[in-house]
Amino acid sequence: MAAAARARVTHLLRHLQSTACQCPTHSHTYSQVPGLSPSGKTTDYAFEMAVSNIRYGAGVTKEVGMDLQNMGAKNVCLMTDKNLSQLPPVQIVMDSLSKNGISFQVYDNVRVEPTDGSFMDAIEFAKKGAFDAYVAVGGGSTMDTCKAANLYACSPHSEFLDYVNAPIGKGKPVTVPLKPLIAVPTTSGTGSETTGVAIFDYEHLKVKTGIASRAIKPTLGLVDPLHTLHMPCQVVANSGFDVLCHALESYTAIPYSMRSPCPSNPIQRPAYQGSNPISDIWAVHALRIVAKYLKRAVRNPDDLEARSSMHLASAFAGIGFGNAGVHLCHGMSYPISGLVKTYKAKEYNVDHPLVPHGLSVVLTSPAVFTFTAQMFPERHLETAEILGANIRTAKIQDAGPVLADALRKFLFDLNVDDGLAALGYSKDDIPSLVKGTLPQERVTKLAPRAQSEEDLSALFEASMKLY
């Protein structure tokens, strides 16, 4: 009898180990046969987490001089933009560097929404300066520019397109050692302090692209919530929309075990690997913070709890998407911002037309998640509930519309522009918008549902008006 009971228990355990859990949280395809997709194509069997060291705390920026001293830095490049160069975050960094005897030069010509031209200007400054460390103080534009400057200054014989993502660039792996880079984010959106990604507008083709490599992630991110108090309300909102979509897209991305090809060498495994059990945790937690705090952070500039929470959410979502990736909202956003006509966002002090990155991302989100919900609908319903939807009576086949409605309500409550038409786009622009999305295969291929050019056209058309 005892032997028979043991045999039954052993059989049951083997069955449980070979059967994927079907609850909403664990029903993703992580348990399929490694290395082989249902279609027979070779797929990946592993994922890895690459994250910058993060230090969080009110006033933590003043430690930057000690950090650089501990690193042995003697000649530091401090990168920022013209608007921030006279504001407290930069002044605090300069005071800390001076107090700790660190020699530094300031580069304050970073462009909001950088271009290949602005990247190359910063790269030239970095090459001439022969710096042994970098500090980036600002939003994603500053941090991304600094990553690129560090990379190409350490690889002076490389051509600019060598490290740029294919198909626009050659997408070569980064094998050269880089200098230490400390990132001090002053906005709560990009999560760039945690990622090995640097995004820019490639002006010749009028598309956004970037550099993606774990090697370029910052050495340390100093996440100081005091810097969030200076942010205008519209900047808070648009930055928060980036966090929102980072979380939603990484959580609904194709699982890492379904992504192909499987790399022949670990160095070829992309930074954006597909959703995975670790990134999922960060994405969901970030989404809960956005749902609870973003509206408060926008409506009350003095709400330190809300703005501090959003600053952390940006880093959390960065950890998630920095390893899982994003997909259609981001892939479609690049031509939206790159083909901007005359639109100038409120509360952005720039001398050129500008669609803020977070706004360009979130405007397509209702259409995108209606489209993608055919795959992994449980995850779409789960995120809709986090955003406030009542899903108790929702049918699984309605997951897309339920999430889309939750997003529309969220955006409407924050007075977001009524779709792409409000930015100056019309149906006549859709072919150009689709053309600008096609080179973004690095992210669009992570969408849980494949898309044709006709699908992209329909998504842009559905995003012309939200309400």
From Swiss-Prot:
GO terms for cellular component: mitochondrion. The modification N6-acetyllysine is found at K445. It catalyses: (S)-3-hydroxybutanoate + 2-oxoglutarate = (R)-2-hydroxyglutarate + acetoacetate; 4-hydroxybutanoate + 2-oxoglutarate = (R)-2-hydroxyglutarate + succinate semialdehyde. The modification Phosphoserine is found at S452. Its main location: mitochondrion. GO terms for biological process: glutamate catabolic process via 2-hydroxyglutarate; lipid metabolic process. CDD domains: HOT. Expressed in kidney and liver. Its EC number is 1.1.99.24. Keywords: Acetylation, Lipid metabolism, Mitochondrion, Oxidoreductase, Phosphoprotein, Transit peptide. The keyword Lipid metabolism applies. One of its GO terms (molecular function) is metal ion binding. It is found in: Mitochondrion. Belongs to the iron-containing alcohol dehydrogenase family. Hydroxyacid-oxoacid transhydrogenase subfamily. PANTHER family: ALCOHOL DEHYDROGENASE, HYDROXYACID-OXOACID TRANSHYDROGENASE, MITOCHONDRIAL. Catalyzes the cofactor-independent reversible oxidation of gamma-hydroxybutyrate (GHB) to succinic semialdehyde (SSA) coupled to reduction of 2-ketoglutarate (2-KG) to D-2-hydroxyglutarate (D-2-HG). L-3-hydroxybutyrate (L-3-OHB) is also a substrate for HOT when using 2-KG as hydrogen acceptor, resulting in the formation of D-2-HG. This is Hydroxyacid-oxoacid transhydrogenase, mitochondrial. It comes from Rattus norvegicus (Rat). The lineage of its organism: Eukaryota, Metazoa, Chordata, Craniata, Vertebrata. The gene is Adhfe1.
